[in-house]
Design a protein with these regions (language model features):
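Short gly/pro/ser/thr-enriched loop/turn and capping motifs at secondary-structure boundaries
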Residues: 82-83, 114-117, 180
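C-terminal and late-domain segments of enzyme folds
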Residues: 1-18, 25-38, 42-46, 121-123, ...
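Catalytic nucleophile loop
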Residues: 75-78, 97-120
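Hydrophobic anchor at the start of a short beta-strand
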Residues: 51-52, 107, 202-206
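An acidic, phosphate/nucleotide-engaging active-site surface
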Residues: 70, 83-102
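Portal/gating segments that form or line small-molecule/metal binding sites
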Residues: 24-26, 30-83, 87
Length: 226
């Protein structure tokens, strides 16, 4: 099994401004799966990075504050966001992530590694029927919808949770292979790991609950939210 870094991660590495970026991998949501760490290490090493990890199984692999704040990029893998959040809080990784963010470390990730930075969103952490998660870190003061085009429950549940005020009135959602750059807490640009048609391909969405109605605006890859 092998993996090559996609455009989004390569762009994140470029944003560090370092010739050899220090990358910290965090795969809590997958139970610190060793195979996933191995293929991730290989991919980032081939890209010229110094790679470390922040594990919690079977015990923390480093002091969270020291490890995360000493990185240029923290990349969080997918899996169970509910388990991720519980374990991060148990081990103080949540506070260390905030310290890293406030110090300018680039934070990113996929699936659970996207949801965790927001207020909450939809998750399969509890089973095949999707449920809300509302206790994410909240660095980004919006709800988040991941796998928006790939799982039939995702879009309608996000809309319903916003109508019911379980989630807030503003969310950002992404189809598979698509991501959103944030500068501080402001959504700026839509990016993708694939060569997709901005008009018809996978996209990002700004979802708003306004005067009792859901208003969803599509942003193709390369678009700006400004």
């Amino acid at each position: 099994m092998s993996w090559r870094l996609g455009t989004m991660i390569k762009d994140a590495l470029a944003l560090t401004g370092k010739t050899r970026p220090r990358v910290c991998l965090v795969n809590t949501a997958m139970g610190d799966n060793l195979t996933y760490y191995a293929i991730s290490y290989e991919a980032f090493n081939e890209a010229g990075c110094d790679v470390t990890e922040m594990k919690v199984f079977p015990q923390p692999s480093a002091d969270p504050e020291e490890r995360l704040c000493g990185s240029d990029l923290v990349w969080v893998g997918g899996g169970s966001v509910a388990n991720l959040l519980a374990l991060w809080r148990l081990h103080g990784i949540d506070d260390a992530m905030r310290s890293a963010w406030e110090q300018g470390v680039i934070l990113g990730g996929v699936s659970a590694g996207s949801l965790c930075w927001h207020m909450g969103g939809t998750t399969d952490s509890f089973g095949q029927i999707l449920q809300p998660v509302t206790n994410a870190l909240g660095f980004l003061p919006y709800a988040n919808g991941v796998h928006y085009d790939a799982e039939a429950q995702r879009r309608p549940l996000l809309h319903q949770l916003m109508r019911d005020e379980v989630l807030g009135p503003l969310a950002y959602a992404t189809d598979n292979t698509v991501g959103i750059w944030y500068e501080g807490t402001e959504a700026t640009t839509v990016v993708s790991d694939s060569d997709v048609d901005p008009e018809s391909g996978p996209a990002a969405y700004k979802v708003e609950f306004v005067e009792g109605e859901i208003v969803e605006t599509r942003y193709g890859v390369g678009s700006s939210f400004a």
